[in-house]
A protein has these predicted regions:
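Aromatic-lined, polymer-binding surfaces characteristic
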Residues: 2-6, 11-23, 27, 45
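C-terminal beta-sandwich/jelly-roll accessory domains of carbohydrate-active enzymes
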Residues: 230-235, 239-244, 264-337
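Noncatalytic carbohydrate-binding groove/subsite architecture in carbohydrate-active enzymes
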Residues: 20-170, 232-242
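Generic recognition of flexible, low-complexity loop/linker segments
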Residues: 18, 34, 68-70, 124-129, ...
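Conserved, mostly hydrophobic/aromatic
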Residues: 5, 30, 80, 122, ...
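Flexible loop/turn segments at secondary-structure boundaries
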Residues: 8-15, 52-57, 86-91, 143-149, ...
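Aromatic/acidic polysaccharide-binding cleft in carbohydrate-active enzymes
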Residues: 134-249
């Protein structure tokens, strides 16, 4: 059973080097034959969207797909994709997955935060054609992309995974949560052994990466309802060009009424006190779990649990909500009942 069908991939580049109008007409033709063959089991059709900030692609593809179509067809698509990778040092050099300094740490996180601008600006164009948000933005390739590990096949794109990747994951997932009215799906490009993977394998050995543990904490947001939230931040960083906020967050409530707060601390060295006000809720129980280590920490086949989820008990219930201190270089999940 196929739930989602992508009609082409990266057609602006390796998928045909097409211009947007040509691709959109090809999409209209071929999507015709992606049919539902069973009542109640809709195959969602995903149109190839832009690479990074190619807003012209988004505009022209939607214009062509919506031309001479009926409103109920919403451009003959259920989703429009977006691809964005974080290359700390640029496309040609990219940079090491494990050997980096504080400048590169903040540069990487600054580039991860760019995802929000991409979602907003592509979203504005989508709103012109699809104000009811019938079409999901599908961020189906994202994550960090470094120079592959020394001694490995360059074509396999094998890279290690550190606390830096854990922060990129937490930052990005918080952004997706906050824009879940438009972002309906998002996918790390590869799950195992490639780029920002969640698992690394070698023969019969397997290790969970720091990214895996962040995803494991964030799973409680899935199928939950977004809760409006904001946080006071300060700007940090080592270079003027690559400043970042010290904290990011997102909040949801699940079907059982349990509140889930996820917060990232982007600082390499500073912890911060968070005094959270929670409205319309009498707090009875609080639990916390955290992924935190120094910025270069990673899991290896020799030391598989260097970075993992640990209990976080430093959460106080206050009259207005919660108070806690989030350690440097960490991703925190707090459950509130």
């Amino acid at each position: 059973k196929v739930d989602f069908f992508g009609v082409g991939n990266e057609n602006w580049g390796c998928g045909g080097n097409m211009n947007p109008d040509f691709y959109a007409n090809e999409y209209r033709r071929y999507q015709t034959y992606v049919r539902d063959y069973k009542a109640g089991e809709h195959v969602e059709k995903i149109c190839c969207g832009a690479n990074v900030d190619d807003y012209e692609w988004t505009k022209e593809v939607l214009a062509t797909c919506f031309n001479h179509s009926q409103p109920f067809q919403h451009g003959f698509m259920d989703g429009l994709s977006l691809h964005y990778y974080v290359h700390p040092e640029g496309w040609d050099i990219k940079g090491s997955a494990t050997d980096f300094d504080e400048n590169v740490w903040y540069k990487t996180l600054n580039k991860a935060l760019y995802m929000e601008e991409l979602i907003k600006r592509h979203g504005v164009i989508m709103d012109e054609y699809d104000p009811e948000k019938k079409i999901g933005m599908i961020v189906d390739e994202w994550g960090t992309w470094y120079t592959c590990e020394p001694g490995t096949n360059p074509g396999f794109l094998y890279q290690q995974n550190t606390m830096r990747d854990a922060l990129v994951a937490g930052i990005t997932l918080n952004i997706f949560n906050k824009h879940s009215d438009r972002v309906k799906m998002a996918n790390l490009a590869q799950m195992v052994n490639v780029l920002q993977s969640v698992l690394l394998t070698e023969g019969d050995k397997m290790v969970k990466t720091p990214t895996y543990h962040v995803f494991n904490m964030y799973k409680y947001h899935q199928d939950a309802t977004l809760v409006e939230s904001s946080i006071e931040t300060e700007t940090i960083g080592t270079q003027e060009e690559y400043q970042v906020p010290n904290l990011t967050e997102s909040v949801s409530v699940d079907e059982n009424g349990v509140l889930h707060l996820t917060i990232t601390n982007l600082s390499v060295s500073e912890s911060y006190e968070v005094d959270a006000a929670i409205l319309d809720r009498e707090i009875k129980e609080v639990k916390g779990e955290i992924v935190t280590e120094e910025m270069h920490a990673k899991n290896t086949f020799e030391e598989a649990d260097k970075v993992c989820v640990k209990e976080f008990s430093d959460v106080q219930i206050t009259e207005k909500g919660l108070k806690f201190t989030i350690p440097a270089c960490s991703v925190l999940h707090v459950t509130v009942k």
